[in-house]
């Protein structure tokens, strides 16, 4: 029997956590039965299980993960919960699609806010908005397109010049920025662990339980794990690009690795070298070449930059070390006054990308469902995708299902080695086009 690949990062999540945050559950040992099995405890899997359990509290639902929620890819992102689409287009149809997308993202934020508030999840939730910044004036056309999109969507924003950005961010690296309210910043490891911890009672969670195979049999499904099997009526795949190794359909998404580093907390002396600053988050005008930055409530800087193909979900220690060197050079370029601030940890995580930006969402086959193809910025997006998939699977009437379906479906991706060559070429092209937005 051929088994699926298991995601593996040769590094540890860098977000500050205590033992209680980890929410460790036992691994599966033995053979069990359930009405539903959910594979993956990220934002889509957790929201799907939560909604399924609330629709029918009599269902028995099993959720498994190859790791635990607090160390999974969903815990490894930069902690931005974004409620606005970036790209709209010029036609009436494209504007309508963007408005639908905004409605989905904002409903995802509302659901997260409700759950965090209800269960008092300590995830450092801060509604502070975000900055979208350019380094080089040659990126002006891209920034102007973003302004035009915000105006079309009738969204509030503020334009800032380099000096104004310095007062907000403490760096003179950027020549221009756009501030938009409404973006939430969190510690994503604490958030996803808290969401998994507070699932309804009819959801049973198993950690360190990778799904090695998924088969349809006898009017149901069978999931093979390291030390057991799960037989269920139906299955939901919340495994993003690795779903192709479990699902009976063609590949439509690829896995990319991104890297982040976090500094030690700044000392009072080091903070004196900066303007008085509150927590903030910054996204670059070019997401592949540029750097995402954050300044946290406990006086740390986070740097997210560099993207590698990770088509089999594996990131090596060597790749992580290379990213750490880049991050330190980048941080010192942005903040020359903080040469004595060390990076405390560097880690990686994977995102799923599709060729046309559309999700992989819906029913893959009889009794098998999925919500994948997050294309980055997936906290709010995958939360609502999981909720709506549960509504669709259970025959619930929800007008946002149509909005989700309007996003389309991801295009076909070729198998390796053609996929490997295509992904490497696309990354090289994006880095070249955005080379002036690379700080180092």
Give residue spans per PLM region.
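Short beta-strand to alpha-helix junction loop
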Residues: 101-106, 133-142, 178-197, 206-208, ...
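Active-site substrate-recognition segment that forms the wall
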Residues: 79, 119-126, 211-213, 229-269, ...
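Extreme N-terminal leader/targeting segments of oxidoreductases
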Residues: 1-36, 54-55, 59-60
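Helical element adjacent to the flavin cofactor pocket in flavoenzyme catalytic cores
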Residues: 148, 173-233
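Helix-loop-beta segment of a Rossmann-like dinucleotide-binding subdomain
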Residues: 122-132, 164-194, 306
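C-terminal catalytic lobe of FAD-dependent flavoproteins
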Residues: 309-429
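Glycine-rich FAD pyrophosphate-binding loop
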Residues: 53-76
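Dinucleotide-binding Rossmann-like beta1-alpha1 core, especially the glycine-rich loop
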Residues: 83-162
């Amino acid at each position: 029997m051929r088994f699926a690949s298991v995601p593996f990062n040769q590094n540890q999540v860098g977000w500050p956590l205590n033992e209680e945050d980890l929410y460790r559950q036992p691994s599966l040992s033995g053979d069990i039965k359930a009405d539903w099995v959910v594979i993956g405890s990220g934002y889509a899997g957790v929201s799907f299980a939560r909604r399924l359990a609330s629709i029918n509290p009599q269902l028995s639902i099993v959720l498994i993960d190859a790791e635990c929620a607090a160390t999974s890819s969903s815990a490894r992102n930069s902690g931005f919960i974004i409620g606005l689409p970036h790209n709209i287009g010029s036609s009436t149809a494209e504007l309508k699609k963007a408005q639908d997308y905004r409605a989905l993202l904002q409903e995802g934020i509302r659901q997260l806010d409700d759950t965090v508030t209800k269960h008092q999840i300590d995830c450092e939730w801060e509604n502070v908005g975000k900055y979208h910044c350019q380094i080089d004036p040659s990126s002006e056309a891209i920034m102007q397109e973003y302004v035009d999109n915000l105006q079309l969507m009738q969204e509030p924003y503020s334009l800032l010049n380099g000096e104004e950005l310095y007062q907000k961010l403490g760096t003179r690296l950027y020549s221009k920025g756009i501030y938009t309210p409404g973006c939430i910043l969190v510690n994503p490891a604490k958030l996803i662990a808290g969401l998994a911890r507070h699932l309804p009672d009819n959801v049973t969670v198993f950690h360190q339980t990778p799904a090695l195979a998924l088969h349809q049999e006898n009017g149901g499904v069978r999931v093979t794990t390291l030390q057991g099997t799960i037989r269920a009526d139906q299955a939901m795949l919340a495994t993003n690009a690795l779903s192709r190794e479990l699902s009976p359909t063609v590949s439509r998404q690829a896995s990319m690795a991104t890297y982040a580093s976090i500094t030690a907390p700044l000392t009072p002396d080091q903070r004196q070298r900066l303007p008085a600053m509150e927590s903030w988050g910054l996204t670059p005008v070019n997401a592949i070449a540029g750097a995402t930055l954050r300044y946290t409530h406990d006086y740390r800087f986070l740097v997210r930059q560099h993207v590698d193909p990770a088509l089999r979900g594996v990131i090596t220690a060597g790749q992580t070390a290379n990213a750490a060197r880049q991050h330190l050079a980048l941080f010192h370029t942005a903040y020359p006054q903080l040469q004595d601030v060390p990076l405390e940890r560097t880690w990686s995580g994977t995102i799923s990308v599709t060729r046309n930006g559309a999700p992989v969402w819906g029913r893959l086959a009889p009794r098998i469902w999925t919500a994948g193809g997050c294309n980055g910025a997936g906290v709010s997006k995958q939360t609502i995708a999981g909720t709506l998939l549960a509504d669709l699977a259970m025959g619930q009437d929800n007008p946002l299902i149509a909005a989700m379906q309007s996003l389309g479906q991801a295009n076909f991706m070729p198998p390796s080695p053609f996929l490997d060559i295509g992904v490497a070429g696309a990354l090289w092209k994006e880095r070249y086009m955005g080379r002036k937005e690379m700080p180092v």
